[in-house]
Regions:
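Interdomain hinge/lid region at the active-site interface
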Residues: 165, 213-279, 297
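Active-site-proximal catalytic alpha-helix in oxidoreductases
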Residues: 131-132, 136-139, 160, 164-196, ...
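Hydrophobic beta-strand scaffold residues
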Residues: 28, 48, 116-118, 159, ...
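Rossmann-fold NAD(P) dinucleotide-binding segment
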Residues: 52-64, 68-116
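Beta-strand segments within the central parallel beta-sheet cores of soluble alpha/beta enzyme folds
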Residues: 151, 201-208, 260-264
């Protein structure tokens, strides 16, 4: 009989990740509040659960992929949560992007119960999850990382143990400040080129092929030019992540002036009602600052 994995959180990222594991032959038991997400898992060969307890029961590996710190604390540490039902020796992997301190709190609680805990936030967005090419930043013990490597190899392209508990979240925070900054600069480049009457599509092709090239330019330049901001990763979630960045900077007593600017732009996006759009919608914020209505108009 194949190994059973309990997977809690089948949203934009969790759904394709759980599907990869089910198609690889794992017995995946999934739990989510959205019925359509459970149906997707069943279509991939998994099984739906009706509660956290049912998801955890019989699972030698338990995975969570949740939006933010309060969700992780409630689902994992709360009443009738994961740690009330999990057995000693179980490998617990949290793919959520949360504060390092929250991951350390989860690890402390899990260790007290004999649970092997890893924080393993990911980068790559919805497309990365669908294509199983995520970058996975891991915090925890080396032996537990090696035990989880087969899982990481099925849902991602690269994974690395970055340090002890919470280290994965620290690296994810750094990732998010780079991603947010890159989106903001690409947005400004588009606005500048269009204001100067340049063929912005040709211009971005040139940027993508030179030193300014990035994964964001590779994957997002066409949709940004089309002002297609269908969410792969929502502004609201990036706002949460920038809060993590700034909290970490205060704790480390370091100055990150550009991160403050990026956080302000993301907050402006939310104030303009763009929170449910993709983080590439920072382009709309830059256009609004310049009195434009898309494509330099």
């Amino acid at each position: 009989m194949s190994q059973q994995i309990g997977f809690i959180g089948l949203g934009i990222m969790g759904s394709p990740m759980a599907g990869h594991l089910a198609r690889a032959g794992y017995q995946v038991v999934g739990y989510d509040l959205v019925a359509a997400s459970l149906a997707k898992l069943e279509a991939a060969g998994g099984r739906r659960a009706s509660s956290i307890a049912e998801t955890v029961e019989g699972s030698s590996i338990v995975i969570t992929m949740l939006p933010a710190d309060p969700h992780v604390e409630a689902v994992v540490l709360g009443e009738d949560g994961v740690f009330e039902h999990i057995k000693p020796g179980t490998l617990f992997i949290d793919f959520s992007s949360i504060k390092p301190g929250t991951s350390q709190k989860v690890a402390k609680a899990g260790t007290a119960k004999g649970v092997r805990v890893l924080d393993a936030p990911v980068s790559g967005g919805e497309k990365g999850a669908i294509d199983a090419v995520l970058s996975i930043m891991v915090g925890g013990d080396a032996a537990d990382f090696e035990a989880a490597r087969p899982i990481f190899d099925l849902v991602g392209k690269t994974s690395a143990l970055c340090g002890g508990h919470g280290a994965g979240q620290a690296v994810k925070a750094a990732n998010q400040l780079v991603v947010g900054g890159t989106y903001a600069l690409v947005a400004e480049a588009i606005v500048l080129m269009e204001a100067l009457g340049v063929d912005a599509a040709a211009g971005l092709d040139m940027l993508a092929g030179g030193l300014a090239g990035s994964r964001i330019l590779e994957l997002k330049r066409a949709s940004m030019l089309a002002r297609d901001f269908k969410p792969g990763f929502r502004i609201d979630l990036h706002h949460k992540d920038m809060g993590t960045v700034l909290d970490a900077a205060r704790q480390a007593d370091v100055s990150l002036p550009l991160s403050l600017q990026v956080a302000a732009l993301i907050q402006a996006a939310r104030a303009q009602g763009l929170g449910n759009l993709d983080h590439s919608a920072l382009l709309a914020v830059i256009e609004n600052l310049n009195g434009l209505n898309g494509k330099g108009q």
